[in-house]
Amino acid sequence: MDKAEYEGAINRLVAAAELVVSGASDEQRLDALAMLAFFRLRRARIAEHGVPHISSEDLFTGTATAALTLAGRKELLAASALLDQARMLVDA
């Protein structure tokens, strides 16, 4: 995966996480904020570390798009599940 494609996917994931945080209940807010922090940190580290290993690049980019789409439709639980899936695809 090239840097531009990764950046685009991370930006979609950050946007989806921001939407999930804004609509999360009090019980879900902490998990949503943790997910947002994870993707913001990944975005900030692109310059230093480059693109990390992604176990399935096509699944990662598709998941990013789907998460943003569902978050935009206020399907917050589904978007959260997709954010979690994307997180698992990124090797730490």
Regions found by a protein language model. Give the residues of each.
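Long, charged/polar, soluble alpha-helical segments
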Residues: 1-92
